[in-house]
Structure formats: C-alpha cells, structure tokens
Amino acid sequence: MHIKTLTVSQLNRYVKNTLDADFILNNASVKGEISNLKIHSSGHIYFSLKDGGSKINCVMFKSYAYNLKFAPENGMDVVALGNVSVYEKEGSYQLYVKDMKREGIGDLYVAFEKLKEKLKEEGLFDDVHKKEIPKFSKKVGVITSPTGAALKDIINVTKRRNKGIELLIYPALVQGTDASRTLIEGIKILNKVEDVDIIILARGGGSIEELWAFNNEELAYAVYNSKKPIITGVGHETDFTIVDFVSDRRAPTPSAAAEIAVFDREVLINEILNYKYNIKNYMENIIKEKRNYLNLYKQKIEANSPTNIIVNEYKNIDNLKELLNMKIEGKLNKEKNNLSRLSSLLEAHNPLNVLKKGYTLIEDEGNNLITEKEALKELNKINIIFKDGRAKLSIEYIEEF
C-alpha cells in the first residue's frame, strides 16, 4: 500500500476541509464555562469554553460580538453557537462563535418579554398615565437596600445638590424571592406619608437574575397604581426592567434618579437672582419709558398753555415789529439813496453850474431862454443871468460872424 507523504500545510488544509464538510461541526452548539477571556481593541473576543473534563479555544469576531445581549465574563456559563474549524497556521482547531447565550437565562428572557408585552397591551406603559415629576420636592421617599451602594449614591447626590431635602428611606430587599414583596410594601407605606412628594425605587447594577425582582408583575401594578410619582434607577444605563417601563420616569442609575428628584439649590438661587435681575431691568425700562411719555406730555401741555401762547404771541409781535422797523428803515435808506442819486443827477444838469465857469444865460423880458441871435432882432431889451445875479441890458446892435 502506497502512503502519500503530505506537507504540514497540506495536512492542516486536509483536516480543515474535512471538518468544514461535517454538518454537525458546521452547526455546533456547545455548552461550557468561559475562561481566558480577552476582548481585543479590534472588537474581536477570544476565550475558552471548558467543563469538568476539557476545553476548546473560541473566537467571536466583531461583527457577531456587536449583537451580544450581555457582557461575557470569566466563570460565566454559556451556550455558544458556531462552527468548528482549523486555524491552519497553528494547526489547532477552535470554535468560531456566531452567537452566544447565557445558560439558564433564555427562560428568563422569554418570561421578561412575555410580561412586557402583556403589560404594554394593558396600557401600563402609555405616557398618558405618567404622573408629572414635581420640580421642587421637599421630601423624597427612597426604597432600596439600606446597605447597598445605591443608597450611598442617592445620599451623596442629595447632599451635593440640596442639603435641605429630607430623605425618607424604606429598607427593602432588592434581590431574592422576597424582594418584590418588600418593594411593594415600601410603595404602599410611602404612599401613606402625606408630605412625601416623590419616590425613588433603586438598586445598583447586577445580572439579570439579580435584577429579576424588578420584573415582577405585582410590583409593576404597584408602581402603576402609586398616587405619588415614582422614578426608577435600577442597575446601569444598559439595564432595563419591567418597572422602568411602568414608572413615571426611568433614570439610568440611582445617582441619576436622585439628580431628577432633588432640585439643585444653587441652580435655583441663581435662577431666582436671574429672574430678579430681569424683573428689575424690565421695571426700570417701563419706568423710564413712562417717564419719557410723561415728559413729552408735559412739554405738550406747557407748549399749549395760555401763558405760553401769550408769551409766544408777544414774541411774534416783537419779531414782526422788529421786521417792520427793518423794512421801513430799509425803505427809507433806499429812498434816501434814490434821492441822493437824483439830486446828484440834477446837480450835474443844473445850468447854474455852467455859469460858474464864466458863462451867462440870456432871457427875454418874459424870462424865455434865448439860444440864437435871430431872436434878438425882435427885442430891445434882454436879461443877462450870471452865477450870482442878473442884469437888464438894451440891445445896441447885432453883429454876425
């Protein structure tokens, strides 16, 4: 019989092909305990599954790990679904996990979803039933474990935000078979305390089994029927319980629940001071505006008063009088200038001025001016006019040139 010699790579490839062709190994469902867990920065998860007798290496790639409903931890019992194949480089086989569920949790998830759907159909989750969260609570009821971290967180937040707020704490179990009963009792008792303004139902984080008391149907009805508003702060931000859907406000953590229930005193003081400042400015602006209107109306009244009208008329008369005087003075000056001009013109044409140069004027006895010698032929006597007098002369002869 001839035996074919294979290289290591050929052998690993052959084993891989053989495993990949196996129907059972391609659809394997393996139950075991997680160990050697490593969550890589790439998002891939590497771990081993073990039981009392052996273990198998496993890998869950990022695309599948993204859809996990829980955070895997060492020591956790799970059921992994995937295919068995060979990692050729190392010559080792491992389970390539595509999905993973916590062992024994499946029934709890089914019960959770069933109750959630039932209460939703009954309208317990409807916003119309949500009670208003008071903005300024004076006393806050807290239902939680007296020894848990949740209570410490709530107390710390309350002291930081408002030391004047009173916390009324009802010590309750927050996990175990009797937890739901004590939580319901706490709601009933705090509803009877008249000055409790709001109730916080809280506990710290935990597994689904540890939080299961908050998925109780009777507790859900107790929260729904509470006369006082209830804020739930159960687990961490990713944890959701039935009471979170029923409550009037769901907070991601107990600390966040306290932030909602307890108003910040410093913030309130600052808001009041800000309102005071705004009101002061508003009133000052109104007063300023009204004062301006008052001054305007005052000016109008003063302007239209009889005294001011008379004073203004006197001013108008004085102005008209001054204007009239200016007009008259201007007219007189103009006439004086015209008179002076005409006087100068008349003076320039005064015949007596010619006489001052040694000339004389000749008139007949009727004082008619004689300008030609022919007129003398009919006259015996003439008047001679000098610059400073006149003389009467007789004509002896007339000589022609």
From Swiss-Prot:
CDD domains per record: ExoVII_LU_OBF (cd04489)
Q: Which domain of life is it from?
A: Bacteria
Q: Which UniProt keywords apply?
A: Cytoplasm, Exonuclease, Hydrolase, Nuclease
Name the Gene Ontology molecular function terms of this record. exodeoxyribonuclease VII activity; nucleic acid binding
Pfam families linked to this entry: Exonuc_VII_L, tRNA_anti_2
Say what the protein does: Bidirectionally degrades single-stranded DNA into large acid-insoluble oligonucleotides, which are then degraded further into small acid-soluble oligonucleotides.
Spell out the family assignment given in the record's similarity comment: Belongs to the XseA family.
What protein is this chain from? Exodeoxyribonuclease 7 large subunit
